[in-house]
Amino acid sequence: MKLDYTRIIGLVVVGISITVIFGTMLPQNDMDYSENLSEPITENSNPLIVIVAPSIHEKYYKEVFQEVIDYDVMAVNAMYGKDDIILLADKATIGYFEGRVPDEVLVTSNVVDIWIRDFGTVNTTTEVKFEYRPQYLSVSESDWIDESYEDWFSARELTSKKTDLILDGGNLVFNGQDKAITSVRVFADNPQYSQDEIDQMLKELLEVTEIAYLPEEEGDITGHSDGMVMWVEYDRLLVNEYKEPFRTQVLTELEESLSDIEIIEIPYVFQEGLWKGWPSACGYYLNSLVTENYIYVPVYGLEEDEYVLELIQSYTNKEVVSINAEDVCFMGGSVRCLTWTTDGTDANKILEFAEQN
């Protein structure tokens, strides 16, 4: 894919500034739908990043075990010293990291899957545990994964709101203040509720005032929004530079749903390939992990990597840090998919446990 990086056009549409970088009142109800066990996240608390290693005993990842371990080592070392971070691994696997990452980040745990973003709590200014029951997994598979996380979560005495709404963490992108983005998959996953009911429930649960519901990318199994968009600042949103007519569908939804933001289109490089039926995520730069002071951006060994890193850096005061995701992106996910973050009291509890152990 050859990109022409010289053409930049600024647009203003219904109060939203859109920079294009060219390449080649709702009904009320009284439903009790959540259990509020969440402690407020303090405004300036430091984020804690959590990564989960694959188990040496897990057959599903057997053929890519070493690649994922190597990626985890690289990612932990790149993030260590910038943000608080821990790496969860079971007893049989933790030895693969000893001497390769700082000892204090290693925590023994039996969380069974690496894609913790999807089944972990969703963190805005509060913390919400959604039902993990995605279309792309069987009920037994999703229950097995979710129960392992819930066991770990409750053992640490962590707190969150709980709801019966089905939503993957990878399908919620929060701007840090009052806006969130998901996809229309949330409507399909929760047919027992109307779209207006879901919108109201999400705004109350997440404590936001505006939500955009993006159309799904063609061929995307997950229906996630976190490979499509990324907030680099609370009022500045990066969006993949899609082809028409999908581009207009995405931009129209963002323009009509979110106020007072700047939208910037960023090149991405679609890569063919399937792994166990999962389309590759290689070339998707917006599946980045954003924290208070850093943006960890995946790179893929592509000629566009350096340009996109510089471009993202030009739109944010946060420091952009590259993370080589070549060892994992072919499995259908990238940097954000493989991390979970929490703040405040829960982060402190996890760090205290890690220090004691």
Roles of regions detected by a PLM:
Residues 3-11, 15, 21-357:
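Histidine/cysteine-enriched polar flanking segments
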